[in-house]
């Protein structure tokens, strides 16, 4: 039995155990720009409308992040880029990223997290500080997800 049939929801429902199909209904996936570049067309492997998180790893340029978000959005996916607080230097940078994701990729959702770096690059140290800035509200973002690691994150 094939466990992970991503191509279309109807194909998955017909060829997989119903319990597995129910379990996978509404799944999401995460990519990084460098790994997304290895996939010719995500529509060949994921159902349209799948939520795709775009991981922002320290050292990845915002241009690469926005380009990946734009591509995924144009292919019909619900893009949710990471906003790692410790990589974002100040409110101006946060507002620039938000504007670029919205303007260039049509993004309305975000995953807000502290980020995998030990020392903040600037003013922000936590996801709460990004939320409290009000930048996402002012921009009209529709959904904000928050990730946390109360036990610590070794990334």
What do the predicted segments below correspond to?
Residues 3-155:
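Active-site beta->alpha loop and helix N-cap motifs at the rims of alpha/beta catalytic domains
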């Amino acid at each position: 039995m094939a466990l992970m049939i991503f191509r279309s929801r109807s194909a998955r429902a017909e060829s997989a155990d119903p319990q597995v199909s129910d379990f996978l209904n509404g799944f999401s996936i995460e990519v990084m720009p460098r790994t997304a570049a290895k996939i010719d067309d995500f529509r060949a492997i994921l159902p349209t409308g799948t939520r795709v998180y775009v991981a922002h790893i320290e050292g990845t340029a915002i241009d690469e992040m926005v380009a990946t978000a734009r591509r995924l959005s144009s292919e019909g996916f619900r893009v949710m880029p990471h906003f790692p607080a410790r990589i974002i230097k100040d409110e101006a940078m946060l507002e620039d990223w938000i504007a670029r994701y919205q303007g260039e990729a049509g993004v309305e959702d975000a995953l807000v997290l502290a980020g995998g770096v030990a020392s903040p690059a600037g003013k922000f140290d936590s996801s709460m500080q990004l939320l409290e800035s009000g930048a996402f509200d002012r921009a009209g973002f529709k959904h904000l997800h928050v990730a946390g690691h109360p036990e610590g994150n070794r990334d």
